[in-house]
C-alpha cells in the first residue's frame, strides 16, 4: 500500500533512484495505491546525466509493494520493498530496462510493455 509521502525505490533505468509519492491517482479521496496503480511522484534521488532529474514531478506505476496482495486462488504475494516504474503520459516506461521481478497483476492493468521488459513475473 502506497500513500502520500511514501518513499519508493525505482525499478528501471530512467535515472531516478528514489520517488516521493505526492498523489494517488483515481478519485478525489483515494488514499492508497496498490500494485498496478498510478501515482504522481517527485524524484528525490537521481543519477547525473539521466532522463529524469532530481525535483522532477513524474508519473509512476507501482510494481512491488511490501504489503501482501491477495490473489483469487487464495495465495498472497509480497515483496521486500515498495518500487515503481517511471512512465510517460502514454503509460509507457521512460526507461528501457526493468530491474527485479514484477507482479502478475500488472497484466490485468494493461502494462504489457513493463511485463515484457521485466526479467521475471511473479
UniProtKB/Swiss-Prot annotation:
Record's PROSITE patterns?
Answer: RIBOSOMAL_L14
What do the Gene Ontology cellular component annotations say? cytosolic large ribosomal subunit
Offer an example of a GO molecular function term for this protein.
Answer: structural constituent of ribosome
Q: Which CDD domains match?
A: Ribosomal_uL14
Presence of keyword Zinc-finger:
no
Entry-linked InterPro entries? Ribosomal_uL14 (IPR000218), Ribosomal_uL14_bac-type (IPR005745), Ribosomal_uL14_CS (IPR019972), Ribosomal_uL14_sf (IPR036853)
Q: Give the GO biological process terms.
A: translation
Q: Which family does it belong to?
A: Belongs to the universal ribosomal protein uL14 family.
Stated name of the protein: Large ribosomal subunit protein uL14
Q: Which organism is it from?
A: Citrifermentans bemidjiense (strain ATCC BAA-1014 / DSM 16622 / JCM 12645 / Bem)
Amino acid at each position: 500500500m502506497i500513500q502520500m509521502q511514501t518513499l519508493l525505490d525505482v525499478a528501471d533505468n530512467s535515472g531516478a533512484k528514489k520517488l516521493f509519492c505526492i498523489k494517488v491517482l483515481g478519485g478525489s479521496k483515494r488514499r492508497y495505491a496498490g500494485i498496478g496503480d498510478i501515482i504522481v511522484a517527485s524524484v528525490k534521488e537521481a543519477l547525473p546525466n539521466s532522463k529524469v532529474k532530481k525535483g522532477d514531478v513524474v508519473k509512476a506505476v507501482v510494481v512491488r509493494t511490501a504489503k501482501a496482495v491477495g490473489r483469487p486462488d487464495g495465495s498472497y504475494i509480497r515483496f521486500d520493498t515498495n518500487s515503481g516504474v517511471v512512465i510517460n503520459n502514454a503509460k509507457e516506461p521512460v526507461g528501457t530496462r526493468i530491474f527485479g521481478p514484477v507482479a502478475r497483476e500488472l497484466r490485468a492493468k494493461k502494462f504489457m510493455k513493463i511485463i515484457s521488459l521485466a526479467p521475471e513475473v511473479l
